[in-house]
Amino acid sequence: MRTGKQYLKSLNDGRTVILDGEVVGNVLXH
């Protein structure tokens, strides 16, 4: 089981996330 911190770090691995048609560069700062 991962902690919340580990989960957030895994989201910020350089992937491209598109939210409502906009590219979100940093998921954590969005």
From Swiss-Prot:
It is an enzyme of class 1 (oxidoreductase). GO terms for molecular function: oxidoreductase activity, acting on the CH-CH group of donors; pyrrole-2-carboxylate monooxygenase (NADH) activity. The keyword Nuclease does not apply. It catalyses: pyrrole-2-carboxylate + NADH + O2 + H(+) = 5-hydroxypyrrole-2-carboxylate + NAD(+) + H2O. Keywords: FAD, Flavoprotein, Monooxygenase, NAD, Oxidoreductase. SUPFAM superfamilies: Acyl-CoA dehydrogenase NM domain-like. InterPro entries: AcylCoA_DH/oxidase_NM_dom_sf. Its EC number is 1.14.13.130. Its cofactor is FAD. Homotrimer. Monooxygenase that initiates the degradation of pyrrole-2-carboxylate, which allows Arthrobacter sp. strain Py1 to grow on pyrrole-2-carboxylate as sole carbon, nitrogen, and energy source. To a lesser extent, can also use pyrrole, pyrrole-2-aldehyde, and indole-2-carboxylate as substrate. This is Pyrrole-2-carboxylate oxygenase.
